[in-house]
């Protein structure tokens, strides 16, 4: 009987009878329930009870889908049919290199035309905004192409960009124009020390208006030029206006800029202005201008080069980071109820610069052009002896005056260096 209960494929033998206590019982009726339960197998589960299946046939990875379609150009015909053509091998290789531009060893000797296309492709893929990799990629281009990447940089009132992207800004080389007006740098800022490096010796126009500079900052900026004849030796335009901590002693450090043609020291802490005017004219030939010079209207300095859009992108990112959140309706209603005015979201200006420009005289200097040495040709050959004598005396007197004037700066060639100057020079 146990064999029958355990076997499932056993043939039915028919009714089975059993006698018990003098009574005959049929065993098949009692085993019908057991047999039915044995003949029904338990359902088999292929997956566990909490398992679920999701079809992902149309949900591919974005990078994989881009790799599949990036090699083709899709266009439409006149009939409206979709037509695709393969991209050139140059564009495919250019895209691959731009995706891995931070792994390039060097670009020195690479053609400029191809490098500009590579820079644009990397910029379109936003490779220069990636932390770490963007700085390495930018340094590869600046080391090889210098002023082509950026020849002029305007960061006027962009102190947030300077604080966030200082290393990227320091990577630019061979700049000719640099505008750092209204950035509140101070004497100890790292960027002010970077101005004296050889990488920025090509700067000819430097705007440092309203940067909290003092005589110590001017001394630090001019030390390499005064002693080692390097640094900002090619400077032709300098704007130091609206720095009240610069005094008469600080102006004396500027005499080392022999190529300086335009200087603005309006709004500084000068006491003896008449003496300063005389020294500037005698030492470097700068004359005080009675009218405002157009060189200091900040319209000529603009960001120019391959990386001009990158600088604009930095400005947008920093502006969005400090943008105030939108006030909720209950808060706005409460402000209206209590009569509070919302803050105006206007760009910050230079209040110090405006006050100095309105209150004090503009001290802008320029270098006069040398007069033409070739005078008009005399028509008459007969010249009186008196006129010839006068003409001979004049160049002789002029030569004597020139010798006297040249002897004065020759005596001033030997500059006494302070201990702070030697400490600064030893740091290079």
Swiss-Prot record:
Region (Disordered): 379-412
Tree of life domain: Eukaryota
Family matches, as SUPFAM superfamilies: RNI-like
Record-annotated disulphide pairs: none
Record's keyword annotation contains Electron transport: no
InterPro entries cross-referenced by the UniProt entry: Leu-rich_rpt (IPR001611), LRR_dom_sf (IPR032675), LRRC42 (IPR039631)
Keywords for the protein's UniProt record, in alphabetical order: Leucine-rich repeat, Phosphoprotein, Repeat
Residues with PTM Phosphoserine: 406-407
Pfam families associated with the record: LRR_6
LRR repeat locations: 149-170, 174-195, 202-222, 234-255, 259-280
Family, per entry: Belongs to the LRRC42 family.
PANTHER family named among the record's database cross-references: LEUCINE-RICH REPEAT-CONTAINING PROTEIN 42 (PTHR31994:SF3)
Protein name as annotated: Leucine-rich repeat-containing protein 42
Organism placement in taxonomy: Eukaryota, Metazoa, Chordata, Craniata, Vertebrata
């Amino acid at each position: 009987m146990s064999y029958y209960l355990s076997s499932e494929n056993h043939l039915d033998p028919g009714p089975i009878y059993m006698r018990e206590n003098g009574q005959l019982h049929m065993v098949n009726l009692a085993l019908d329930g057991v047999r039915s339960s044995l003949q029904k197998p338990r359902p088999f589960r292929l997956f566990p009870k909490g398992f679920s299946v999701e079809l992902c046939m149309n949900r591919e990875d974005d990078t994989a889908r881009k790799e599949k379609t990036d090699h083709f150009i899709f266009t439409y015909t006149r009939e409206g049919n979709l037509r695709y053509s393969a991209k050139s091998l140059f564009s495919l290789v250019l895209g691959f290199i731009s995706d891995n531009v931070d792994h390039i060893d060097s670009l020195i000797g690479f053609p400029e035309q191809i490098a500009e296309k590579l820079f644009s492709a990397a910029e379109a893929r936003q490779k220069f905004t990636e932390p770490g990799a963007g700085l390495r990629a930018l340094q590869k281009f600046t080391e090889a192409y210098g002023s082509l990447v950026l020849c002029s940089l305007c960061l006027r009132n962009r102190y947030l960009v300077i604080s966030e992207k200082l290393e990227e800004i320091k990577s630019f080389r061979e700049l000719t124009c640099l505008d750092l007006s209204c950035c509140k740098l101070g004497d100890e800022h790292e960027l002010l020390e970077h101005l004296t490096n050889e990488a920025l010796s090509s700067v000819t126009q430097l705007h440092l208006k309203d940067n909290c500079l003092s005589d110590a900052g001017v001394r630090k900026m001019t030390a390499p030029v005064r002693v080692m004849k390097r640094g900002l030796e090619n400077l032709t335009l300098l704007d130091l206006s609206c720095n009240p901590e610069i005094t008469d002693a600080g102006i004396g450090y500027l005499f080392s800029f022999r190529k300086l043609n335009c200087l603005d020291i309006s709004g500084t802490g000068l006491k003896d202005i008449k003496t300063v005017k005389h020294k500037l004219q005698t030492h470097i030939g700068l004359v005080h201008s009675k009218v405002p010079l157009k060189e200091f209207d900040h319209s000529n300095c603009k960001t120019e080069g391959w990386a001009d859009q990158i600088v604009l992108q930095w400005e947008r990112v920093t502006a969005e980071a400090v943008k105030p959140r939108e006030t909720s309706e209950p808060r706005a209603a409460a402000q209206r109820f209590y009569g509070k005015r919302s803050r105006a979201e206007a760009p910050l200006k230079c209040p110090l610069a405006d006050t100095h420009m309105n209150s004090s005289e503009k001290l802008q200097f320029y270098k006069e052009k040398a007069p033409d040495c070739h005078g008009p040709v005399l028509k008459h050959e007969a010249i009186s002896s008196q006129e010839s004598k006068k003409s001979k005396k004049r160049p002789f007197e002029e030569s004597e005056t020139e010798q006297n004037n040249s002897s004065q700066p020759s005596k001033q060639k030997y500059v006494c260096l302070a201990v702070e100057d030697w400490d600064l020079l030893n740091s290079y």
